[in-house]
């Protein structure tokens, strides 16, 4: 190895995320001065099988949410293990950290410590190789810009309103380029604002930049979005498709084994009834994707959903798979879902994230690279989406710099790729 790509210094610090909570940022410097920096996101609705985000628990600092322990793990333990190692060997770097941690869920050093370092090492190695990150990770075949899943209305755990589902998204599949898709999304977002104003509804934005108006039902959320699409001069179905993130674990009553929909007068649904509820929505509206339609432990319900809708629409497992290879392979062998949400901090290292994406592709599952509700200005996920030709990205609405930063980076990448850039639009859903 050229010793120039040896890791010389690793420095972590506590910074702020988009919700005013502390998070971990890591700098990595190689022997030749190559530099990489990464900041770690965090989620609001967290799956019970996710890698552990280490928080200090000291109530006198940041309400217990400080990350000084994780920072210290990077500066001492991780630095000690990685100093002098070759930054180009990502798999080895990640494995050394996993071995030093020694737990299944990264609970000892913290997934936030490990991930921050993992991504910063990759960025330093890319700088050393004089390549943009997407090219360094993905090689010469990395050229597909993702279809954005833009979360423009929030409900559920992300909002204080009478809407059960956590996210209502638009997917500009009729665009010819990412640049055009972004413009369509922005125009629809502004149209939606005026539709909501016209109905005297709140237009303040939530954690991910979407609106959280006090709508009366799930269907009303869909209807106002369709109005906004048309008002912006686009055609639902032809130009723009819809997506839902039900995040149904949040309205699942474990003791009753029922799904309780507040927007339907607190009616209780069995798994089969909820599947029928979705099927009815899909037959009425141009919905192409539903995420976390059933609780993460309701495998029978998931099987039913997959049998009923799996050939028609994309069924994304988020809490179901938590970007975890073991959970995903169980899903694949049981014929559950047909798509996986990829959140780097759910698994906690770059190489494991890439393995999950690879496994999903081999099984003809689509990949959706995703942000978290607590974000920073870090744009690594834009590069991961292009590097892996994932085809889809979920990184919020059309406001708030923590979201827009990702879109802006994709604009730059598309420009840099020039004529070789691909935007597949509707064909992204190749497995339907």
UniProtKB/Swiss-Prot annotation:
It is an enzyme of class 4 (lyase). Keywords: Cytoplasm, Glycolysis, Lyase, Magnesium, Metal-binding, Secreted. GO terms for biological process: glycolytic process. Its cofactor is Mg(2+). It catalyses: (2R)-2-phosphoglycerate = phosphoenolpyruvate + H2O. The keyword Cell inner membrane does not apply. Its EC number is 4.2.1.11. InterPro entries: Enolase (IPR000941), Enolase-like_C_sf (IPR036849), Enolase-like_N (IPR029017), Enolase_C (IPR020810), Enolase_CS (IPR020809), Enolase_N (IPR020811). GO terms for cellular component: cell surface; extracellular region; phosphopyruvate hydratase complex. (2R)-2-phosphoglycerate binds at residues 166, 343, 372-373, 394. One of its GO terms (molecular function) is phosphopyruvate hydratase activity. The active site is at residues 208, 343. It is found in: Cytoplasm; Secreted; Cell surface. Mg(2+) binds at residues 245, 291, 318. Binds a second Mg(2+) ion via substrate during catalysis. Pathway: Carbohydrate degradation; glycolysis; pyruvate from D-glyceraldehyde 3-phosphate: step 4/5. Belongs to the enolase family. NCBIfam families: eno (TIGR01060). Catalyzes the reversible conversion of 2-phosphoglycerate (2-PG) into phosphoenolpyruvate (PEP). It is essential for the degradation of carbohydrates via glycolysis. This is Enolase. The lineage of its organism: Bacteria, Pseudomonadati, Spirochaetota, Spirochaetia, Leptospirales.
């Amino acid at each position: 190895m050229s010793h120039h790509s040896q890791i010389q210094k690793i420095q972590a610090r506590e910074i702020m995320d988009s919700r005013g909570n502390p998070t971990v940022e890591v700098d990595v410097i190689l022997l030749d001065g190559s530099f990489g920096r990464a900041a770690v996101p965090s989620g609001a609705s967290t799956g019970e099988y996710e890698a552990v985000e280490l928080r200090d628990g000291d109530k006198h600092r940041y309400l217990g949410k400080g990350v000084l322990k994780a920072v210290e793990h990077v500066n001492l333990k991780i630095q000690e293990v990685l100093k002098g190692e070759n930054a180009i060997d990502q798999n080895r770097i990640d494995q050394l950290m996993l071995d030093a941690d020694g737990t299944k869920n990264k609970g000892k050093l913290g997934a936030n410590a490990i991930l921050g370092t993992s991504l910063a090492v990759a960025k330093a190695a890319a700088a050393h190789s004089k390549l943009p990150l997407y090219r360094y990770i993905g090689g010469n075949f990395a050229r597909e810009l993702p279809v954005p899943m833009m979360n423009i209305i929030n409900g559920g755990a992300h909002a204080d309103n009478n809407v059960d589902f956590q996210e209502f998204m638009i997917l500009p599949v009729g665009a010819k380029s990412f640049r055009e898709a972004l413009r369509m999304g922005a125009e629809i977002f502004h149209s939606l604002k005026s539709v909501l104003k016209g109905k005297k509804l709140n237009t303040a934005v939530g954690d991910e930049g979407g609106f959280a108006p006090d709508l009366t039902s799930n269907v009303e959320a869909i209807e106002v979005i369709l109005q906004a699409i048309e008002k912006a001069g686009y055609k639902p179905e032809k130009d723009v498709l819809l997506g839902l993130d039900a995040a149904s674990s949040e309205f699942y009553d474990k003791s009753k084994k029922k799904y309780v929909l507040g927007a339907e007068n607190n009616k209780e649904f069995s798994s089969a009834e909820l599947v029928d509820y979705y099927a009815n929505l899909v037959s009425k509206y141009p919905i192409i994707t539903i995420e976390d339609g059933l609780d993460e432990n309701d495998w029978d319900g998931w099987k039913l959903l997959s049998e009923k809708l799996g050939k028609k629409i994309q069924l994304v497992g988020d809490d179901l798979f938590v970007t975890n290879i073991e959970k995903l392979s169980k899903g694949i062998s049981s014929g559950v879902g047909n798509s996986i949400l990829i959140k780097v901090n759910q698994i906690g290292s770059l190489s494991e994230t890439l393995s999950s994406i690879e496994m999903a592709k081999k099984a003809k599952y689509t990949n959706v690279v995703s942000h978290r509700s607590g974000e920073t200005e870090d744009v690594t996920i834009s590069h991961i989406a292009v590097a892996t030709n994932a085809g889809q990205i979920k990184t919020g609405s059309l406001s708030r710099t923590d979201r827009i930063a990702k879109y802006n980076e994709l604009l730059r990448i598309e420009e840099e790729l020039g004529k070789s850039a691909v935007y597949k639009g509707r064909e992204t859903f190749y497995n339907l």
